[in-house]
Amino acid sequence: MKFDIVLIGGGLSSLVCGIKLQKAGKKCLMVSAGQNALHFSSGAFSLLGKLPDGTDVAEPLSAVETLPSEHPYSKIGKQRLSEYVASVPGFFSDCGVALHPVEATETIHNGYRITALGTLKPAWLAMDDVTLLASKDEKIGEKALIVNFSGFLDFNTRFIAEGLEKRGTECRIESVKLDEVELLRKNPAEMRSVNIARVMNHESSWKAFAHKVQELLNGEDVVILPEVFGFEEPVIMQWIKEMIPAKVVFIGTTPPSVPGIRTQRLLKKAFEAAGGTFLMGDEAIDAAFDGERVASIRTANLGELRIEADTFVLASDW
């Protein structure tokens, strides 16, 4: 088997690289063992959130000039980095990944996303179902109703409430029981975000959940829900927002990440649509060298069949 480029790894960096190369006319193969960093994604993307000394960054591109010379961004250079940054929203849009609208200005600003522990973390871009606050001082609302599924332990409502109350939002925690989700509780291993999200793909299920949230509201101006909706159809999250008479904020759970897996699937689809070959559930186990250059690799599933390429890209997080 001969390709122009073989990419080892199936996460964000490998998929972005593979899509760009495939669209540029290269013949690409991607080898992915399966789970990758997108399965742990927050649904937000960072460019430069903090300086090496821990200082928060407000304007990432402006802060690049203060980085040490050995930093990758310094080596790329601000001008080229700016060009890459400008192309990101369009790239994701072409792949079907919807982001918050970005103003076409020379200066880009970081916002803050709410983590699964209720803390704030700098972020540059976010999927359109992830809430970004303009600053650390911004309150999400005056009164928040935090709603979880009964028995779902991967959404820590207490931590979220503590974090929000420190910033001046009064919080009340409630849980909802749905027959369809209760079936998952028979096996604790099944009570995970992705499995709940699959149940919530059904119109009857997410509508029933939204109706129960409506009944729980008691003067709150914001409702906080676990990010376990829109696994197949992200528009479901918008429909839920339209049904609930308060501002609705989705906050990520502990992994696996529903928005992350959704993004990985969309990027994989875009890579294959561009003509790329994707080996899922396989891994590179051996390499043959021509001098200091990798000439071919062997994978676990292909036995003695070697894969040759002009270039190999290692994007496996190792």
List each language-model region with its residue ranges.
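Short hydrophobic core segments
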Residues: 6-8, 31, 284, 307-317
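Conserved beta-strand-loop-beta-strand element in the redox core of flavoprotein oxidoreductases
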Residues: 268, 285-306, 312
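Short, well-ordered coil/turn residues at beta-beta hairpins
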Residues: 9, 147-150, 226-227, 300, ...
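Conserved N-terminal glycine-rich FAD pyrophosphate-binding loop of Rossmann-like flavoproteins
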Residues: 33-69, 180-196
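N-terminal Rossmann-like FAD-binding beta1-loop-alpha1 element of flavoenzymes
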Residues: 3-30
